[in-house]
């Protein structure tokens, strides 16, 4: 016999269903190729060239990509959940490629803490983060760094995923503390500090 409050049944889309429908709607949006950007398709291999560089990506076999009059359309064969998800994802990735080769992506990090700082060392970063030795962070292929001041790092590149992952990897070298806020954080990140324990 069931004891306690009975679970409430609700009508409507399941969480997964809502996500699939969202990705499907994204996939249906055509992509306009801006002037100065060239897109070519060889089988399922998509190449995007622009002022900032070139990116290539293999398109999933279930997804079709066509181009006419500087407009790219992404289509799926049916409404299966996998294909609806791939539909939106593929459209997003292609759009990111076009934006990257045209304008480049950036992610800014800030360093907080007495004595904490960063300096360029060739193409790499030399980080002083309170350890007994400096931390050298090597730039992955396709990534460059700007250091406008000793407490700011700007990660730059045409691959949005790589820019984001590189910034995340730098942050792990000294994540911000919750008590003093010392460490490396994203420029837009808000650190919710905890109050330290006080003696009685």
Task: Name the predicted role of every residue range.
Residues 3-22:
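Short, Lys/Arg-enriched N-terminal segments with co-localized hydrophobic residues
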């Amino acid at each position: 016999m069931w004891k306690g409050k009975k679970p409430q049944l609700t009508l409507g889309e399941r969480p997964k269903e809502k996500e699939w429908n969202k990705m499907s709607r994204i996939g249906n949006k055509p992509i306009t190729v801006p002037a100065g950007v060239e897109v070519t398709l060889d089988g399922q291999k998509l190449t995007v060239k622009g002022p900032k560089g070139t990116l290539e990506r293999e398109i999933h076999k279930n997804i079709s990509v066509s181009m006419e009059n500087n407009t790219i359309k992404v289509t799926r064969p049916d409404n299966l959940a996998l294909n609806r998800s791939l539909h939106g994802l593929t459209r997003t990735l292609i759009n990111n490629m076009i934006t990257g080769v045209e304008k480049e992506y950036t992610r800014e990090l800030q360093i907080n803490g007495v004595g904490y700082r960063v300096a360029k060392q060739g193409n790499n970063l030399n980080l002083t983060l309170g350890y007994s030795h400096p931390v050298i962070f090597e730039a992955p292929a396709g990534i460059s760094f700007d250091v406008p001041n000793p407490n700011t790092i700007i990660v730059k590149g045409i691959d949005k995923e790589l820019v984001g992952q590189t910034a995340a990897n730098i942050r792990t070298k000294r994540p911000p503390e919750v008590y003093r806020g010392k460490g490396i954080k994203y420029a837009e990140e808000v650190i919710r500090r905890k109050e330290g324990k006080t003696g009685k």
